């Protein structure tokens, strides 16, 4: 299955911030959406998620046009979204946060509890399962949010700045989790200002510049492209790929 955009255009007043952008993500791959501030990457990401409606262009889940569908309908079709801002319910425990989503999936109570226990174990949340959201560290919160996102059994997950506001150890933890999601045949779209952390785990990436796709290709191809280095990465950029084959 593929999630793809075709010829997306977004204008604010007389300014075109996204200018005929087409991207795609397949299940089982990690794709980066990169670019400097003002390049249009966040707007493109939000249109793909369903938070912003395009002026022109289409968004498809396989061959089904989902352009006009709001975010909650896209979630029902298997498109999960993890916001940059804290999205966990601060006054609820970790397990109640996850259960709040499981209760909407049509599972029996027994199936909900079984899935809850599986997610708690998978994301190493046993010690904090009864802690409220406000008591979690940045890394614990991210893990809880990803676990809650998985409660809908998504085919795709959209990650908005997943490495923002977490310490280096938590960054490695999140990268490992993302690699595991890929191994579950989930497609991942990441937009993040942390270029090193993002490119170290992506299979492919799109670089947006002045509202258009300047370059698309593998992380290695992007890192070696002279135009990309000149306009975005810098001439001294060195790609540091990580091996997640054993996760």
Describe the function of each predicted region.
Residues 132-136, 140:
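Conserved ABC ATPase signature
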Residues 34-36:
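The feature captures the beta-strand-to-loop junction immediately N-terminal to the Walker
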Residues 49:
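Helix-to-loop junction immediately C-terminal to a conserved catalytic motif
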Residues 153:
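Conserved catalytic motifs of ABC-family nucleotide-binding domains
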Residues 65-80, 85, 109-110, 129, ...:
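ABC ATPase NBD coupling module
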Residues 110-128, 176-179:
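Conserved ABC ATPase "signature" region
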């Amino acid at each position: 299955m593929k999630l793809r955009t075709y010829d997306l255009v977004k204008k604010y007043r007389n300014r075109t911030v996204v200018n005929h952008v087409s991207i795609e993500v397949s299940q089982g791959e990690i794709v980066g959406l990169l670019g400097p501030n003002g390049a249009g990457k966040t707007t493109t990401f939000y249109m793909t998620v369903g938070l912003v409606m395009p002026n022109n262009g289409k968004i498809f889940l396989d061959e089904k046009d989902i352009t006009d569908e709001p975010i909650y309908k896209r979630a029902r079709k298997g498109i999960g979204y993890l916001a940059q801002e804290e999205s966990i319910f601060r006054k609820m425990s970790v397990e109640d946060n996850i259960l709040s989503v499981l209760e909407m999936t049509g599972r029996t109570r027994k199936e909900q509890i079984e899935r809850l226990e599986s997610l708690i174990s998978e994301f190493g949340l046993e010690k904090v399962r009864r802690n409220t959201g406000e008591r979690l560290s940045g890394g614990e919160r991210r893990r809880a949010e990803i676990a809650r996102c998985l409660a809908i059994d998504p085919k795709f997950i959209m990650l908005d700045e997943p490495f923002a506001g977490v310490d280096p150890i938590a960054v490695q933890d999140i990268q490992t989790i993302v690699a595991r999601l890929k191994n579950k045949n989930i497609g991942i779209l990441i937009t993040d200002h942390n270029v090193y952390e993002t490119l170290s785990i992506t299979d492919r990436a799109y670089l947006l510049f002045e509202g258009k796709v300047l370059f698309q290709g593998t992380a290695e191809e992007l890192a070696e492209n002279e135009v990309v280095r000149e306009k975005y990465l810098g001439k001294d950029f060195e790609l540091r790929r990580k091996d997640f084959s054993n996760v």
